[in-house]
Amino acid sequence: MENARPIRRALLSVSDKTGIVEFARALQQRGVELLSTGGTARLLADAGLAVTEVSDYTGFPEMMDGRVKTLHPKVHGGILGRRNTDDAIMTQHGIKPIDLVAVNLYPFAATVANPDCALEDAIENIDIGGPTMVRSAAKNHKDVTIVVNAKDYTRVLAEMDANANSLTYTTRFDLAIAAFEHTAAYDGMIANYFGTKVPTYGVQDEASADSKFPRTINFQFIKKQDMRYGENSHQAAAFYVEADVKEASVSTATQLQGKALSYNNIADTDAALECVKEFAEPACVIVKHANPCGVALGNDILEAYNRAYQTDPTSAFGGIIAFNRELDAATAEAIVSRQFVEVIIAPVVSEEAKAVVAKKANVRLLECGQWQGKANGFDVKRVNGGLLVQDRDQGMVTLTDLKVVTKRQPTEQELKDLLFCWKVGKFVKSNAIVYAKDSMTIGVGAGQMSRVYSAKIAGIKAADEGLEVKGSVMASDAFFPFRDGIDAAAEAGITCVIQPGGSMRDQEVIDAADEHGMAMVFTNMRHFRH
């Protein structure tokens, strides 16, 4: 057997006590002696298990309200002692070998996530003895097994049963890696939290408020998938996800069928899903190369899909389709019978819809679960030698936020379309222009270096598909620096505009809208997307 080590003595000390009684009982049934500390020891004893308190084993009591429990040579000597090398000195000092350590750490992240958390609470939830034992056991994985995740209890027991109560080196090494990842993430959380207590850079006042952004920033992501290649075929790639993410997302979605998701599939699906989350009504978003090419609302998702597809059938070919309602069979049939699609994602997929999509085996079908709003957090962009870190763009406007700046007031329908259009524009690459009518996009101008050309492209798109622009509204993700964008929109038939405002030439732009009889509202909020 491959460098197997028998498990005869285990030290159990956990904050997350999920499954620990069952694990301890199973170990004891296999003849393993149990050592434990504090609350874990009491829990095991109350469950009728024979357990030795670490303080009884070391002859040294827990002290300082539990701050010092396991920091003792008889504990760490038992973990770090090299079998067949340190045996004599261990015997000389009465140190018993500890073969398995099951430890997880004080709930620091949960503590500091509480908005009422005081600095003292955070400090008392910094684990000292736990990480020390974890690192000691992981360092000595040649002889010792470390378990930091309750999900591994079953794995350990199964291998013990298969190997006469022993564990292989491969398993010990794998668990040691998990342990180092665990302590790295834990220390990163602590550094991130205390890093926000440093005075904001550039502010000399020592009493300045805490910074939202720590002095150093630590992230930990877990590899979910190796990919055939990245954005291009000559680039290697993998997909990493955050641990314990609760928000419905492409990262947490379950793939029901189809080929493995590609790098570009994941990026585009994220864009489509985040856009469709903006809407309360049944909605469909079709994305191509990270830009919405068709977005619409409907009485149901079939109507929403048909209308979104109508915006730009050419670009929808090979696109990503996202819904904010259950995917039903009728909608699935409409999609697969009409177009080539890379990915379909919805909160739920009916059994009937699964059967329909199964006829197209290569279509990637994802189920992401329902969502309750969007979580706050950071957006990160990599630049050469650095990271740009900012809040997620959660900004949105309501009717009460709109400021009418023209002589003509928007109609009730125009106001409804303006808010729809504004939500879509948030997800279009800058410079972004969106034309919409009756809660349906009719033209999207994305990613142009001049705003007027984005406006012209939106009009061209609508004309190419035979969509009537007259009476439509336009959203711009940033202000118009000149009146030319308004003139182009008016020529296409736009009657109402929503934009942030804030240009030195705002009055010139407003005058242009008045000349054309258009209504215009300012949001005082920009939605650049690069």
Swiss-Prot record:
Gene expressing this chain: purH
Organism annotation: Tolumonas auensis (strain DSM 9187 / NBRC 110442 / TA 4)
Gene3D superfamilies the record matches: 3.40.140.20, Methylglyoxal synthase-like domain
Superkingdom of origin organism: Bacteria
Domain notes: The IMP cyclohydrolase activity resides in the N-terminal region.
Protein name according to UniProt: Bifunctional purine biosynthesis protein PurH
UniProt KW Hydrolase keyword: yes
Alphabetized GO MF terms: IMP cyclohydrolase activity; phosphoribosylaminoimidazolecarboxamide formyltransferase activity
Membrane spanning residue stretches: none
